[in-house]
Regions:
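Conserved hydrolase catalytic core segment
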Residues: 1-12, 18
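Hydrophobic/aromatic beta-strand patches that form the interior of the parallel beta-sheet core
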Residues: 11, 99-101, 128
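Helix-rich cap/lid subdomain of alpha/beta-hydrolase
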Residues: 22-63
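Acidic catalytic loop of the alpha/beta-hydrolase fold
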Residues: 70, 105-109, 136
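Active-site nucleophile elbow and catalytic-triad environment of alpha/beta-hydrolase enzymes
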Residues: 72-90
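Short beta-strand/loop motif that positions the catalytic acidic residue
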Residues: 94, 100-102, 106
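Short alpha-helix in the alpha/beta-hydrolase fold that links the catalytic acid
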Residues: 96, 110-119
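Catalytic active-site module of serine/aspartate enzymes centered on a nucleophile-bearing elbow/loop
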Residues: 124-158
Length: 158
């Protein structure tokens, strides 16, 4: 958000502003120690893939996808830490009307942190929470509701 960007509308689904599961203290400490000397060192993410969607086929496809990595480098970890803080601090600078979509049972990201970020927005905004839905809303039982919310937001006046 350093350079001016003209956006008509923004749609954000399950933003990673904080993870929705505890990161072991030893991983955080190791990432801090290793970052300057071995930034490419990687750790397993520890995601519970059964929490991506209520549809077991989503987990199966995720595991079979050769482009999906189950690890994160310490460089990427620290970049994400800084980006999360930056996104939270700069929330009031977002001026485009913003739609936030989250599943209430998302355990991949922190829904509470997403709602806190949403509360910092000063632009026109709407938050749609999908009760019982997991992380990948577009692959969950609420898919049609999500598509309607996106369509309605995209076509809304203003």
């Amino acid at each position: 958000m350093d350079a001016p960007v003209s956006l008509h509308r923004v749609i954000i689904q399950a933003p990673l502003l904080e993870v929705g599961f505890p990161i072991p203290g030893w991983k955080k400490a190791a990432a801090g120690l290793l970052a300057p000397m071995w930034p490419t060192c990687s750790f397993r993410l520890g995601l519970d893939l059964s929490k991506l969607s209520h549809d077991p086929a989503v987990e199966t496809a995720y595991r079979a996808d050769p482009l999906v990595h189950q690890a994160i480098s310490v460089r990427t970890y620290w970049s994400l830490q800084h980006a999360k803080v930056d996104a939270f601090e700069r929330a009031p600078a977002l001026h485009a009307p913003t739609l936030l979509l989250c599943g209430t049972d998302d355990r991949i990201i922190s829904v509470e942190r997403a709602q806190q970020w949403f509360g910092r927005l000063t632009c026109p905004k709407r938050c749609v929470m999908f009760p019982g839905a997991y992380h990948e809303l577009h692959h969950d039982a609420v898919r049609e509701e999500v598509m309607r919310a996106v369509r309605d937001w995209t076509l809304a006046d203003g």
